[in-house]
Amino acid sequence: QLGPPPRPQIPP
């Protein structure tokens, strides 16, 4: 089972 998709990296 695949978990939730990775969240996009938000630059600081």
Curated annotation (Swiss-Prot):
* NAD found in the keyword field: no
Q: Give a yes or no for keyword Oxidoreductase in this entry.
A: no
Pyrrolidone carboxylic acid sites (modified residues):
1
MF terms from GO for this chain are: peptidase inhibitor activity; toxin activity
Recite the UniProt keywords alphabetically: Hypotensive agent, Metalloenzyme inhibitor, Metalloprotease inhibitor, Protease inhibitor, Pyrrolidone carboxylic acid, Secreted, Toxin
GO CC terms for this protein?
extracellular region
Task: State the family it belongs to.
Answer: Belongs to the bradykinin-potentiating peptide family.
Its annotated function is as follows: Bradykinin-potentiating peptides both inhibits the activity of the angiotensin-converting enzyme (ACE) and enhances the action of bradykinin by inhibiting the peptidases that inactivate it. It acts as an indirect hypotensive agent.
Q: What is this protein called?
A: Bradykinin-potentiating peptide 12b
| Organism this protein belongs to | Bothrops jararaca
